[in-house]
Amino acid sequence: MTTRYTQTGLWIEEKDGVVRVGLSEKGQDDVGEVMFVELPKFGEKLRIGDNLLSVEGAKAVSEISAPITGTVQKVHDELEDENEKLNSTDRDDNWIIELTEVSGFTSAEFSDSPWFGQKKPEEV
């Protein structure tokens, strides 16, 4: 299972036709400490560019777009009451959704670095 990253601060992992999407280290840095999150609904069909996640953090209020097309098979519902899990570095905590019927997921469009070629803030 390979982890790929988007420029908008998400990580993506595919296993057995199911794609899990979560908030990467870069996404966490962009938003700051998460205080509120609005998640997609189970069964929702997302297209590339659709709103995947609305998140309010210490640094920004952001609408994060879906990086791939697919159907929401599972939502990490715990995030609604425990949104601080999005601040975790543990992927078992900071995942957002799982998608099936996925298209638009070609690894060439994504990076193998969470910072997508940028330097980490402490390296600047």
Region locations from a protein language model:
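Conserved hydrophobic positions within beta-strands
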Residues: 9-11, 64, 72
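Short, Lys/Arg- and Gly-enriched loop/turn segments at beta-strand edges
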Residues: 56-65, 82-85
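Residue-level recognition of beta-strand microenvironments
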Residues: 12-14, 55-58, 75-78, 102
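Short glycine/proline-centered loop/turn elements that form peptide/ligand docking sites
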Residues: 40-41, 51, 58-61
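Acidic, low-complexity mobile loops and tails
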Residues: 1-48, 84, 88-103, 107-124
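A cytosolic small-molecule/anion-sensing beta-strand core signal
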Residues: 68
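Short, well-ordered turn and helix-capping elements at secondary-structure junctions
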Residues: 23-27, 50, 59, 76-79
